[in-house]
Amino acid sequence: ITDATTNQLLAMAHRRLGPPPVPYAWVAAGSQGRLEQTAKTDQDNCLILDDSFEEATHGAYFKALSTFVCDGLNACGYVYCPGNMMAVNPQWRVTLSQWQNYFERWITQPDPNALMLTCVFFDLRFIGGTASLFQSLQEEVFPLAQKNGIFLSHMVANALTHRPALNWWGGLSWNQAKRHPKSINLKHNAIVPIVDLARVYALAEGI
C-alpha cells in the first residue's frame, strides 16, 4: 500500500511540475525498505539523482517534488520521520556519486553516527523513477561492505547492543517503565535484533 501510495504521489507531482529534468530514483529506507511496516509507522525515503544534476538548474524541481511526496505521505498517515531521514532533507537528496561517497565514508569510518545511518540506508528498496541509478549504487556499495572486515565487526558490535527481551534464566524480561509496566517493546526487543542479525549476514555475503 505504501509503495502504491508513493508512486501515485510521484505521478501527481510529475503532472503538477512537469517531467523530471534529469533521471532520479525514489528509494524507500528503514521499515518500508524492508517491507515490514506496521499500522503505525513513519516514513524513511531518499532520492538518488543522476550525476548530470546541477543544483542551480534542477534543484528547485526536486525540492518541490520531494516536498509534495513527503507531505502527501504524511497526509496519508505515514508521518514525517522524527530524524528527518526523508527526501525533503537536502542531505538525502543528492547525486549517485554523492551517495557512493556517503556509503564509502560510513564503511571506512564506522563511528556511532555512521553505524546508525547504515542501519537505515543499507535497507534501501527502489520505489519509482529510474531503477538503474539504484542498481548502480548497490553494485558499488555491497562489494565494498563485504570486503571490509573492520566495518562488519563494528556492525556486529552494534547489533549486540539490541538485546531480546530475555533474562538470564531464559524467561521474559519485562519493561519496567512506569508508563507501560509489565510490557515488552516488540520492535526494539524482538524485531530489531533479528533485523540487525539478518543485515550483518546479508552484507557479509554481498547481498
Q: Residues of each region from the PLM?
A:
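Conserved catalytic core of two-metal-ion nucleotidyltransferases
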Residues: 1-8, 16-23, 56-119, 132-140
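Active-site nucleotide-donor binding segment shared across nucleotidyl transfer reactions
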Residues: 2-58
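Conserved nucleotidyltransferase catalytic core and NTase-mimicking acidic/glycine-rich helix/loop elements
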Residues: 22-23, 129-207
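Cation-handling catalytic/transport regions enriched in His/Asp/Glu
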Residues: 26-27, 34-39, 45, 51, ...
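Secondary-structure capping and boundary motifs in well-ordered enzyme cores
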Residues: 28, 32-39, 61, 65, ...
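Generic structural "secondary-structure junction" signal
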Residues: 41, 105, 123-124, 171-174, ...
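Feature representing long, continuous alpha-helical segments
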Residues: 47, 67, 71, 192-195, ...
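N-terminal intrinsically disordered, cationic/polar leader segments
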Residues: 119-129
